[in-house]
Structures are given as structure tokens and as C-alpha cells.
Swiss-Prot record:
Residues 1-22 have a biased composition (Basic and acidic residues). InterPro entries: TIF_eIF4e-like, TIF_eIF_4E, TIF_eIF_4E_CS. It comes from Oryza sativa subsp. japonica (Rice). Belongs to the eukaryotic initiation factor 4E family. One of its GO terms (molecular function) is translation initiation factor activity. Residues 27-36 have a biased composition (Acidic residues). One of its GO terms (biological process) is regulation of translation. Residues 1-43 are annotated as: Disordered. Keywords: Initiation factor, Protein biosynthesis, RNA-binding, Translation regulation. Recognizes and binds the 7-methylguanosine-containing mRNA cap during an early step in the initiation of protein synthesis and facilitates ribosome binding by inducing the unwinding of the mRNAs secondary structures. It comes from the Eukaryota. This is Eukaryotic translation initiation factor NCBP. Pfam families: IF4E.
Length: 227
């Protein structure tokens, strides 16, 4: 077997290992859940339709060729929302992917999670990656946003957020999850994404753990799994 093939096989075996023990709910988790329940009750009384979680939309616009720019410094919060009504107000005012400059990223994440590899919620996780022609990316992005906000993905508690990356020749959608070593959760999430987006069989999905992205300083190169 060639060294490159051996490396890929070893990486995939590493991804399939499940070392993490089940998380034990903490007092902070209980407090956060109580706050969420209180928030939903307030919104119901006000006549709104509360989402299960509050979400934050972030925007990144990097200047081509400006390598000295800090990625974290470039991430700007646009808005947050927690009801169906506030979501649609926000979404209807967003610029559509076809009109966004390259390179640009839109990040829709659960409140409390920043769209950074180093964030505590993301550090042990990874992302599923799907590449689209620019002519069709807008429809799939909208479907993915609705699936996330509607809490429809399998292993939804393991999902951190979704990203639209507008590039010169293509647009890329990615779904970030918390635990790259939980092979069952990773593969079930892949199947759930395919099902909800109604992806044609010709579309290839790639997976990359965030620690690998940190090592090679790249979001979308050198992916581990394909399927």
C-alpha cells in the first residue's frame, strides 16, 4: 500500500474511534436549559413562535491578498433571533449568495458558539462540506438554513452551525458538529443532510475535523472522508 493511502486509511480509522464518554449534565447545563424555557415562555405569551434555540448570524469578508488580517477580527456579528417571526425578518433582508462578493462567509450558529475552530464547542468537532455551482447554491443554502433553524437534522444537539463560503469559482456549504470522533453521529448527520437537502447522487460530501484544519491552516483542502 502506498504511503498516501496508508495515511488516509489511518486517518479514517482514527475518525471512527469513539473515545469520549457520555457527557454528564452540569449545573450550568441545567441553568442554561431553564433560561431557554423561560425565554420560550415569554415569547409564547407575547404571541410569537419560539425556536428551540437562539441563533446568531455572523459575516466574514476578507480582503484578497491581505494575509496579515486576523480571521477572528474579521468575523462580524450581524443579528441574532429566537422566534420564527424574527428569523424571517432577518432572512428576508439578507443579500443572496449570488450577489455576495468573493471571498465571503456567512455563519449561522447557535448562540454561545463562535464560528471558530478553536471555540470550545468546536474544538473536538469537524464539518461536512458540499461544493456547489454558483447558479444553484442559493437554493441549497436556504434549505440548509431552514433545516438548522427548524431543528430537523439528526443528532441536532451535536450540530453547532452552518456556513456559506462564497468563492470565485464555487460556493461551499458546511455543517459543523461537536464530535469528530463519534463515527455514528458523523455518518448519520451526513445522511440527514443528504435527505433534507435532497442532494442528487452526483454531489460529493467531504468531512474534515477541525484539528486537521488547524494543522494545515485550511478549511476545505485535505479532507478525510468522502461519501
Amino acid at each position: 500500500m502506498e504511503p498516501a493511502a496508508e495515511k488516509r486509511e489511518a486517518e479514517q480509522e482514527e475518525l471512527q474511534q469513539q473515545h469520549d464518554e457520555p457527557a454528564v449534565p452540569s449545573a450550568d447545563d441545567d441553568e442554561a436549559e431553564a433560561e431557554e424555557n423561560e425565554r420560550r415562555n415569554r415569547e409564547l405569551k407575547a404571541g410569537f413562535h419560539p425556536l428551540r434555540r437562539r441563533f446568531v448570524l455572523w459575516y466574514t469578508r476578507r480582503t484578497p491578498g491581505a494575509r496579515s488580517q486576523s480571521y477572528e477580527d474579521n468575523i462580524k456579528k450581524i443579528v441574532d433571533f429566537s422566534t420564527v417571526e424574527s428569523f424571517w425578518v432577518c432572512y428576508c433582508h439578507l443579500t443572496r449568495p449570488v450577489s455576495l462578493p468573493s471571498p465571503t462567509d456567512l455563519h449561522l450558529f447557535k448562540e454561545g458558539i463562535r464560528p471558530l475552530w478553536e471555540d470550545p464547542a468546536n474544538r473536538s468537532g469537524g464539518k461536512w462540506i458540499i461544493r456547489f455551482k454558483k447558479t444553484v447554491s442559493g437554493r441549497f443554502w436556504e434549505d440548509l438554513v431552514l433545516v438548522l433553524v427548524g431543528d430537523q437534522l439528526d443528532y441536532s444537539d451535536d450540530v453547532c452551525g452552518v456556513v456559506l463560503s462564497v468563492r470565485f469559482n464555487e460556493d461551499i456549504l458546511s455543517v459543523w458538529n461537536r464530535n469528530a470522533s463519534d463515527h455514528q453521529a458523523v455518518m448519520t448527520l451526513r445522511d440527514s443532510i443528504k435527505r433534507h437537502l435532497k442532494l442528487p447522487h452526483s454531489y460529493l460530501m467531504e468531512y474534515k475535523p477541525h484539528d486537521a484544519s488547524l494543522r494545515d491552516n485550511s478549511s476545505y483542502r485535505n479532507t478525510w472522508l468522502r461519501g
